[in-house]
Amino acid sequence: MRIRNIRDAHLKINKAKNIIGVDNLKTKLDPKKFNALEIGSGKGGFIYQKAITNPGINYFGIEKNATVILKMINKSELLEQLTNLFIVHDDFALIDHEFPNACFDQIYLNFSDPWPKKRHAKKRLVDLAFLNKYQRILKADGIIEFKTDNDQLFNYAIEMINSLEQIKIIAYTNDLHSLDSSDALLKNNVITEYEQRFINLKKNINKIVFKFI
């Protein structure tokens, strides 16, 4: 469903202390801490819950839609009290070169835009070009978690991952919520309103965890 843009959303979000620019992001990246990045944070349901649950971890979200960020700010009353959550209003594809090498311990890709048309394949966040970007900014043994309701996008991700010898698949499933509750793929899984919607519809959720070797 298309989100109706809020007028001057980009100006309103800049007043929130958790919204930072790329330059400020570099100063927030503490090499002594565990740093996690979510690309395409949406309304922030996932990263917000992660930051609350894990105060010792620094969470960084990138979201290019100002209206979506504003909805997150308005919805999350405790947002500004969190000192370990930072949101960058930008497009990862345009700013990835600004990130230092080996600066993140973990990357999350949650319900990314599937870009279903073949001519848009390079825009998919699991395309080879993006995987190479992730490899550069991940620390040694850094982990990537990718979760999607879109089966075609998941199959594409598997194809891209299998084409690279330097990637090791740790675990994956085509039906996350059919697994036993003790399964590692469900450990610390955050169910957002978006994901719950698909669970209610009995739609399978795909998930893969992998790293570079």
Swiss-Prot record:
<feature type="binding site">
    <location>
        <position position="91"/>
    </location>
    <ligand>
        <name>S-adenosyl-L-methionine</name>
    </ligand>
</feature>
<comment type="pathway">
    <text>tRNA modification; N(7)-methylguanine-tRNA biosynthesis.</text>
</comment>
<keyword id="KW-0489">Methyltransferase</keyword>
<keyword id="KW-0808">Transferase</keyword>
<comment type="function">
    <text>Catalyzes the formation of N(7)-methylguanine at position 46 (m7G46) in tRNA.</text>
</comment>
<dbReference type="InterPro" id="IPR055361">
    <property type="entry name" value="tRNA_methyltr_TrmB_bact"/>
</dbReference>
<feature type="binding site">
    <location>
        <position position="38"/>
    </location>
    <ligand>
        <name>S-adenosyl-L-methionine</name>
    </ligand>
</feature>
<dbReference type="InterPro" id="IPR003358">
    <property type="entry name" value="tRNA_(Gua-N-7)_MeTrfase_Trmb"/>
</dbReference>
<feature type="binding site">
    <location>
        <begin position="192"/>
        <end position="195"/>
    </location>
    <ligand>
        <name>substrate</name>
    </ligand>
</feature>
<dbReference type="GO" id="GO:0008176">
    <property type="term" value="F:tRNA (guanine(46)-N7)-methyltransferase activity"/>
</dbReference>
<feature type="binding site">
    <location>
        <position position="117"/>
    </location>
    <ligand>
        <name>substrate</name>
    </ligand>
</feature>
<feature type="binding site">
    <location>
        <position position="149"/>
    </location>
    <ligand>
        <name>substrate</name>
    </ligand>
</feature>
<feature type="active site">
    <location>
        <position position="113"/>
    </location>
</feature>
<keyword id="KW-0949">S-adenosyl-L-methionine</keyword>
<keyword id="KW-0819">tRNA processing</keyword>
<protein>
    <recommendedName>
        <fullName>tRNA (guanine-N(7)-)-methyltransferase</fullName>
        <ecNumber>2.1.1.33</ecNumber>
    </recommendedName>
</protein>
<comment type="similarity">
    <text>Belongs to the class I-like SAM-binding methyltransferase superfamily. TrmB family.</text>
</comment>
<dbReference type="Pfam" id="PF02390">
    <property type="entry name" value="Methyltransf_4"/>
</dbReference>
<feature type="binding site">
    <location>
        <position position="63"/>
    </location>
    <ligand>
        <name>S-adenosyl-L-methionine</name>
    </ligand>
</feature>
<dbReference type="GO" id="GO:0043527">
    <property type="term" value="C:tRNA methyltransferase complex"/>
</dbReference>
<feature type="binding site">
    <location>
        <position position="113"/>
    </location>
    <ligand>
        <name>S-adenosyl-L-methionine</name>
    </ligand>
</feature>
<dbReference type="InterPro" id="IPR029063">
    <property type="entry name" value="SAM-dependent_MTases_sf"/>
</dbReference>
